[in-house]
Structure formats: structure tokens, C-alpha cells
Amino acid sequence: MTEIEKHYNKHKEENRLLTRHGKVEFAVAMKYIHDFLPTQDKHLFKIADIGAGTGRYSVALAKEGFDVTAVELVKHNLEILESKHEHVKCWPGNALDLSFLPDETFDATILFGPLYHLHKEEKKLTALKEARRITKKGGKIFAAYLLNEYSILSYCFAQNRILELIKSGNVSEDFHIVPKENELYDYVRLEDIDRLNKMGGIKRIKIFSPDGPADFMRKELNSMTEETFKKFIEYQICNAERQELLGAGSHIVDILEN
């Protein structure tokens, strides 16, 4: 069993997006996805969800009438997704090799998750290249990353581990997480994403933060009334593209045109 499988067997992805901070992420991401989806003839619009987890996005989009294909590496997650019987075509697979999916098949491709776990730039570029291969020319790709500063602040400083992690080489002198091969996550800064796009010759349409400060405000979100919480989601949608806030959340989504 891989480290990724061990992690997702223990930490249920199904539950994460049902928390209030997870609901912020989902609501904002879905708003941006819908900006590029048709309102008619939805059954003709093909969406690939690579790293689909237990199907939070796949199932929601399939229920709206879109033609959704989901690919998931973790067997436990895939079994949950398949059990939902929501007309989602499900495949076991790895974002680095989507050879079972034909070229230029999908109108949009969602890549939420795989890039979190790929430590080297060449592997990230391979995943992006595969996503581009299966996406039609002019189609959209939604690529999500984990952000460096969230980990530095919420883990390294908040848990008082920053000094030992710098000493061990896990954090650089300029406070960038340095992932070891056996670690689960990789964290990036905006300039890292820009460099990947330049290396891959990838065109960005826009970039946005799906969660903003939500992960830093879990207790506060949980104490909000339903009305106030809805207003917080409105706030994040309104501010998701603000340049001065992009790198401060825990996730970021790069919308690319193939």
C-alpha cells in the first residue's frame, strides 16, 4: 500500500469537503468551474475528473447532466465513488499515465489532488501534459496546488517546529518547504506555478483561491450562523482573484486553456 493510499484510508476525503472550510473550497471552485460550462446540451459536454477522490465534484457535475469520467488512484476512494451510482464513468488510474483515455476527448479536465502529491517538477509537468493530451483544443484545465505559506504558518510555526525543520533541511532558509521523497505533500508558491506553466508552454486564463483564509479560520467558521457563513462564501467568491491574497490560502487553482 502506498503512502497516498494509507493517508486517504485514514483521513476520509469524503468528510473533508463536508466541513465548513471544505464547503467554502467546494462552493468557490464550483462557481469558477461553472463559468466555463454550457447551460444547454450538458450531456454533450465531457468532463474528466483526474484524482476524483470519492467524487465530490464528479457526482455533483454528473447530477447536473454533464458527461463525467472520473479517475482515482486510491482503491478505497474509488469504491466509495462507484457505490454512489451517479452515472459517472469510473477508472482506477494515475495522473501520470492516462493512456486508457483517448487524445482530445474532454471539453474540460479537473486536476484537483494529483499535483499535491507529485514532488518533482518533471512529474508535475507529466501530469499536466497528460491532462492536456486528453483535453480538446481550446478546452479548459483546472489545476489545483497546495500553497507553501499555509504549511509554514499552520504547521511549522504554529506547532513550534520551524527551527528543527530548517536544521533538518525540510525547510529552506527562505522558508520554502523542501519535500522528501517519502512525504505525502508538495507545497508551492505562485512563482513555482508560473515556472511550470512557462516550462510546459501552458496558457493561463486566470488563477484563483478557492478557500482564502478558510483553513486558518476553522473555529470561527464553525461558530458562524448559517446566514453569516453564506456571507463568508460570498466574500471568498468576491475576493478569490485578488492578487495580494492569492498565496495566503491553503489551495490555489490555475485555470488553463489547452
Predicted region positions:
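A short acidic, Gly/Pro-enriched loop at the edge of an enzyme's catalytic core
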Residues: 99-109
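A C-terminal cap/extension of S-adenosyl-L-methionine-dependent methyltransferases
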Residues: 206-258
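A short SAM/SAH-binding and catalytic strip from SAM-dependent methyltransferases
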Residues: 108-122
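Class I SAM-dependent methyltransferase SAM/SAH-binding core
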Residues: 55-97
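Short alpha-helix
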Residues: 184-201, 207
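Conserved class I S-adenosyl-L-methionine
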Residues: 1-41, 56, 142-169
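A short glycine-rich, Lys/Arg-flanked "PGG" loop and its adjoining helix->strand segment in the class I
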Residues: 125-137
